[in-house]
Amino acid sequence: MGSFSIWHWLIVLLIVVLVFGTKKLKNIGSDLGGAVKGFKDGVRDGSTAPADPAQQVTANKSADANTVDVEAKQKS
């Protein structure tokens, strides 16, 4: 009595099909499959090493010469 037999599962399946309908179950299955595929693609993309190493950005000296350092005064 601890486990369900095949007949129990078939009756449950029949009730689910009658309640939701085959079209709704088909849509749920395709949505679930798309979600699993998206998850696998996300995991695969996150585990790959970057192909191109990041390049160091050099400071533009002409822009630094024109920069003015100011302090904001607090309005009283």
Curated annotation (Swiss-Prot):
Residues 44-76 are annotated as: Disordered. Pfam families: TatA_B_E. InterPro entries: TatA/B/E (IPR003369), TatA/E (IPR006312). GO terms for biological process: protein transport by the Tat complex. One of its GO terms (molecular function) is protein transmembrane transporter activity. It is found in: Cell inner membrane. Gene3D superfamilies: 1.20.5.3310. The chain crosses the membrane at residues 1-21. It is a single-pass membrane protein. Disulfide bonds: none annotated. Keywords: Cell inner membrane, Cell membrane, Membrane, Protein transport, Translocation, Transmembrane, Transmembrane helix, Transport. Residues 55-65 have a biased composition (Polar residues). One of its GO terms (cellular component) is TAT protein transport complex. PANTHER family: SEC-INDEPENDENT PROTEIN TRANSLOCASE PROTEIN TATA (PTHR42982:SF1). Part of the twin-arginine translocation (Tat) system that transports large folded proteins containing a characteristic twin-arginine motif in their signal peptide across membranes. TatA could form the protein-conducting channel of the Tat system. HAMAP family: TatA_E. Belongs to the TatA/E family. NCBIfam families: PRK02958.1 (NF002813), tatAE (TIGR01411). The Tat system comprises two distinct complexes: a TatABC complex, containing multiple copies of TatA, TatB and TatC subunits, and a separate TatA complex, containing only TatA subunits. Substrates initially bind to the TatABC complex, which probably triggers association of the separate TatA complex to form the active translocon. This is Sec-independent protein translocase protein TatA. It comes from Methylibium petroleiphilum (strain ATCC BAA-1232 / LMG 22953 / PM1). The gene is tatA.
